[in-house]
Amino acid sequence: YAIFALLFGFSFFIQDDNQRLRGNDFRLRFCWRLILLFLIGNINASFFTAEVLVLYSLVGFILPLTCRLKDKWIFALACLLLIQPLPLYYVIRACLDPEFVTPAIPTRSFWNATFAVQSNGNFLETIRVNLWEGQLASLAWAWDHGRVFQTAALFLLGMLIGRKGLFLKEHLKVWNKVLAGSLVAFFPLYGLGNMLPDFITNKSILTPLSLCLLYTSDAADE
C-alpha cells in the first residue's frame, strides 16, 4: 500500500516534469485523468468493495494543487499529514475537556448494509449497494484508520522523491539510512501503542492517539 502510494506521486512527477520540459502544463490533464480514475474505480467497486482507486482519485488532487510549491513546503505539508492532524487535535481537545467525545462515522452500519445485500441480494442489488453503501463503508474505513491523511502524505513524498532523484543508484545509501531509522523507530512506537490501553481509559483520547502512533483504530467497530 505505502509503495503504491509513493509510486503514484512519483509517476505524477515524471509526467509533470516531462511535460514541463516541453513547455506544457500537465496539471489540467492530470485532473482529467483523476476523473477517469474515479470512474474506473467505481466500475471496480461494483464487484469489489474494498478497492482504493476512488480514494486515490479524490486524494490525488493534492498533487496538481501543490506541485509548484518549493520542496521545503511540500516536505512540511507531508510531515503534517503524516502525524494525523485531525486525530491529534482530538487528543488535545479530549485532554483539555473530559466531556469531549470524538466524532464518529457510522462505518459499521455501512458495512452491515453492504454485507446484508451481498449475502442475500440479486446481481443488480449487489451492484447498487457496492456503489453506494459499499463505497461509503470503504471511504469511512479509510478515514477511521488515517488512510486519507497518510495517502496524501505519501503522494507528496513520492513527488518529492522524484524531484530529488532519490531512486537513482547514487542515493542507495539514503534508503539504507531510512530503513535503519524506520526499524529503530518501529519497536518503541509499537510497544508504546500496545501499552496505551493499560494507561488510558478514555476512548476519546485512546482511539485518535493510537491512530497517530500506529495508524490503528477501533473506530470501525463503533
What are these regions (language model features)?
Residues 46-62, 73-78:
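Hydrophobic alpha-helical membrane segments of integral membrane proteins
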Residues 62-77, 160-181:
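Solvent-exposed interhelical
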Residues 80-157:
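Long hydrophobic alpha-helical segments that form multi-pass transmembrane helix bundles
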